[in-house]
Amino acid sequence: MIRIRFGMDVLLVVLLATCLLTPAHGTPLEWDFAVTLRTKIQFMDSSWQTIATAAHEFDELSALTFDESEELIYFNDLKHRNGSIFSLKRDLIAANHVAEQTIARTGNESVGGLAYDPLNMNLFWSDTEQRKIFFAPIHGSVTPKVLVDLSAEGGRPDGVAVDVCRRKLYWTNSNVTHPTVERINLDGSNRTVIINSDIDMPRGIVVDQLSDRLFWIDDLKGVFFSVESCKLDGSDRQVVLKDKHHEPLNLAVTNDAIYWTDRTTRAVWSHPKVPVIKVTTTSKPEEEDSTDSTDFKDPEPVAEDCPLVRVANLSEEARGIVVRTGFYQRLQKDHHCASIVRKVKERVVEQNRKFEIRSMLDQKIKVLEDERCMNGGEYRAATDLCICPTGFKGSRCEIRECHNYCVHGTCQMSELAYPKCYCQPGFTGERCELSVCSGLCLNGGHCRVSKDENEAPSCECPAKFGGARCEQNSTEICSLFCRLLKHEPEMYVPFGCHSICEELAQDNSTNIAVPQYEHLEVCLTPRVWTSSVIIILVVGIVSSLLLVAVIVHGIRRLYKPKRPRIRKTFVVRKQARTNSAGDTPLTNRPLATEQCEITIENCCNMNICETPCFDPKLVEQTLSKSSCKEDKKILIHNMEDDLY
């Protein structure tokens, strides 16, 4: 009987150890990001792959916060009848998540933002309906108390964030008529407005303990939004990015990037923490996660390319977001946070002692648990996790962060517990993976690296090559001078080209391909009679001839003499005198009483000019009796009668 019981004890120890050492499927032992959707909480790793989901029994999740000391997530459900704020923790035996009510519902609350103080174990949240900020301890059924009341002044609290090290609470006032970013001590004293200008509708806010800065989202007028930053006292304000077609709610900050949730695109976006004043560009989305696939329309891109990345596509509307920052590992040496971190760790250690069981079986399990954390890691029985010392990571602290991190250099841990590489001479890059000689020397040149780090690498060129990178072929350059040397023997030739010219002369230059150097084309004979020059010349000559012809014609017209006026006088008489045998009608003038004179100007024969000869008086008499053709006949006939 004793043997059977002892065997069962050993079997039970083995089974429990196996359960503790083997993570169950769907349990986020190593999650880095947690995002609240409308009906669930989604856990993702550092590459934004979904590893688990939880809180499926809720209908309208919104804000959330994370207690890194005890691995607890606190979240809000807007439609739950009994509770307002809940906690989510892992069940070690069932290998799943258990949600418990933390803050009971007292009315029609509408939680906008959540924050947690791990030292005093208090929750802080903003109520957008009552326009107040409340706080309450997570243990016990204490009625929530009001920390800040903005209802009298018309304010609307939205995002909240706790500065654990300096014991202050920051919040955003999203009232469009008077928006602000404010802070107050956790005991309710010394309320201060730190931002009240150039701001439209601030939403989520977060305190970055690593850089001692504030980051918040500003929902600008129209379709624009921005992410801004400042020091904890409101100074050194910077615009990290400005974009459009997003509806961001909450944000989280890591060592080098900012992440925020967007309800419009149902996605999580990221951007470097370095300020970029220019308008950014929305990048194309990555492939959707197999766990949550949905159809979406990518936002309209803007003008410029910028490091704005869509890191995760979600199946539902994205709301709250938290990130694992390594608070207790990164800030152990920070002069503002060292004492707070020490106190929190002491409290956690004290709580862990309550979970120790004094039985022999439990002591054996305790040995297995302690052996789970390697490299000096501290085991947390309540959460079944290892808190690793600086320089190690992994679920059991089994991975050295500097292992194979630097390719050509020495790895050391920085003050913020991140690996940093010190490169060997001739190598550069974040991990010393880039050679300074890579692609530098051409045409077989050899790269030389000086021992002086400030001196640039140089190239040792082979024969017949030169230049800073051995890019100049002296044979090809000298061949140009050799070609000109045949025509001008006295021409100057650079040093070293004479021997090459002799070699080319012996080979008749048949085995050398002479290149075309535009900067040396001045040495060649220029081509004068090109097609464009000929066309321009012909057009110029023709135009000149036409211009001369026009000028000559104009001069001739200007100086041409006028045609003389023809004036003729005809003498008409009734009857010729017969007193002289030699008198004729043309030689004998008629008597004054028997003759008349007709003066015709500018007239001539009808066959020669256009002006006919006629008697104006006779025309007046016969104008009404005959036509124009008959008048001409009469005039000519009368003229013949008078002349002959």
From Swiss-Prot:
Glycans are attached at N82, N108, N175, N190, N313, N473, N508. Residues 553-644 are cytoplasmic. Has a role in spermatogenesis and oogenesis. This is Protein cueball. GO terms for molecular function: calcium ion binding; Wnt receptor activity; Wnt-protein binding. One of its GO terms (cellular component) is plasma membrane. InterPro entries: 6-blade_b-propeller_TolB-like, Cueball_EGF_LRP_Nidogen, EGF-like_Ca-bd_dom, EGF-like_dom, LDLR_classB_rpt. It is found in: Cell membrane. Residues 398-430, 433-471 form the EGF-like domain. Its main location: membrane. The gene is cue. GO terms for biological process: canonical Wnt signaling pathway; oogenesis; positive regulation of circadian sleep/wake cycle, sleep; spermatogenesis; triglyceride homeostasis.
